Amino acid sequence: MRKLPLSSFGGLVVAVGLVACSGADSSPGSESSTAASQAMSEIQHGNPDSDARGVHWTREVHAARPGGKGGSPLMTNHGGKIMPTYVSKAIFWGTSWGSYSGDKMTGLDSLYTGHSNSNYAKTVDEYSGTNGFVGPSGVHQGHIVDTSAASGGGSTAAILAEVCKQVTAGNIVPDAGGNGYYPVYTDVPRGSAGYCAWHSAGSCNGVALQFAFFWNLDGDAGCDPQDTTTGHSQGLAALANVTGHELEEARSDPASPGAWYDSSGNENGDKCAWTFNVPSVTFSNGSQWKIQGEWSNAAYNNLTGYPNRSGQSGCIDGH
């Protein structure tokens, strides 16, 4: 879900805002107070603060949300940049990652590596911004393990601070063009929060970047794609599916003032969330993933997509 002004946190800057609309002018103090009240309300109800974009809601919450029928389902360009390419590096944050021996780290490295130049990555190629078209290629630089205690997903500033911590330590060198994407995988269970992941934008030391947050989804039915074919652990399969959602949204709608989303604020991943066309999609390195489709205006207009949960046939997965 697209949420879009700029709010500063010391040396950190996070893209902020509400669902795109033409609001009335207000005094800075009133605006700040309103934003703070909204953020606190969202955190108390298990939602991320209003800086988060592309929120991947759980199966149950997504099913209960308005389906978007009645108007045009097409996404439109709101005048911002896209990511013509990307550089990714994952952060595994939390005390339990130090002794972890499962398949999540190697699996997610494989997913990001194989995503580059895959047909799945090409599902976003039709979208353009002020800096050109989204391209299918990217470079994955592996991962970092930080065994300090992780925060949950209620505060985008806390997640950005973790990314900036790794920048300061020299573990991440942000892409100078603003095309760096740094997903943070925590060991914190979702609990009662109504979402599986989100992405946002900010800066570290004056360099713009994209980042994302993910809960530990082990045994989490609300965020489980129910993968029975790839051989991945349930926890990896759940993270892989929501990873596809967030990465493709970041590429087509990375930062203020925003690029591609529909009249309800839904980005390409939101519009096809929890819909799967085939049991698995093969990436460029041969790895296979049960992963949701992404919205394509072209597929919808040409009647070549498969239907989302609202019956709008604009989803594609490149299989």
Task: Indicate residue ranges for each PLM-predicted region.
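Bacterial N-terminal signal peptides that target proteins for export
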Residues: M1-G10
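N-terminal carbohydrate-binding/catalytic regions of secreted carbohydrate-active enzymes
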Residues: S41-C164
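Bacterial signal peptide processing site
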Residues: S22-D25
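Loop/turn elements at helix/coil->beta-strand transitions in domains of secreted/extracellular proteins
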Residues: P84-S88, G177-Y182, V207-Q210, L236
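Active-site recognition of the HExxH zinc-binding catalytic motif
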Residues: N241-D253
